[in-house]
Amino acid sequence: MGRFIFVSFGLLVVFLSLSGTAADCPPDWSSYEGSCYRVFEQKMNWEDAEKFCTQQQTGGHLVSFQSSEEADFVVSLTSPILRDSFVWTGLSDVWKECSFEWSDGSDLSYKDNYQFVFSEYECVASKTKNNKWRIIPCTKLEYFVCEFQA
């Protein structure tokens, strides 16, 4: 009887530790730290990609990075699929106010040591191999990653 209770308790602990992980994300989406991510192998301009992401899931946007670990996770998703390419991030200055912001409204606390030089270009793409950021024209066609809170 004691062994049965011990095994039952162990199974309960395993079940509870697994709930709240990838199970919160739809099929074809990957889970990390309470968010779901999906790489799309089609190219769009920044505005169309952002709109597409908002239509995929409630609260969806182009990916935003809050830490280097999150950026590394996204690289681990994009690099095997897209090889050496760029993907749109949700970071932009589409209002041309010399103020870059994430499309999901989150704080710009993680910048990957990037020094923002304001120019005629307004949107930020990330390199799939190493997460190096580039400010490029928003009209350029790039792959993209969507994200939403699970």
UniProtKB/Swiss-Prot annotation:
Q: Mind telling me which Pfam families this protein's record contains?
A: Lectin_C
Cross-referenced SMART domains: CLECT
Keyword NADP assigned to the entry: answer is no
Keyword 4Fe-4S assigned to the entry: answer is no
Q: GO CC terms on record?
A: extracellular region
Q: Where in the cell is it found?
A: Secreted
Q: Which UniProt keywords apply?
A: Blood coagulation cascade inhibiting toxin, Disulfide bond, Hemostasis impairing toxin, Platelet aggregation inhibiting toxin, Secreted, Signal, Toxin
Name the domain of life.
Eukaryota
From which residue to which does the signal peptide run? 1-23
Tissue expression from the record: Expressed by the venom gland.
> InterPro entries per the record?
C-type_lectin-like (IPR001304), C-type_lectin-like/link_sf (IPR016186), C-type_lectin/snaclec_domain (IPR050111), CTDL_fold (IPR016187)
Boundaries of every C-type lectin domain copy: 32-147
Q: Which Gene3D superfamilies match?
A: Mannose-Binding Protein A, subunit A (3.10.100.10)
In alphabetical order, the GO MF annotations are: toxin activity
Q: State the disulfide connectivity.
A: C25-C36, C53-C146, C123-C138
Q: Give the family from UniProt.
A: Belongs to the snaclec family.
What the protein does? Answer: This potent antithrombotic agent acts in a calcium-independent manner. Exerts its anticoagulant effect by two distinct mechanisms. It binds to activated thrombin through exosite 1, blocking fibrinogen clotting, platelet activation, factor V activation and other effects, and it interacts with prothrombin (F2), decreasing its proteolytic activation -especially in the presence of factor Va. In vivo, intravenous injection before thrombosis induction causes a significant decrease in thrombus weight.
Q: Self-association or partners: how does it assemble?
A: Heterodimer of subunits alpha and beta; disulfide-linked.
The name this protein carries in UniProt is Snaclec bothrojaracin subunit beta
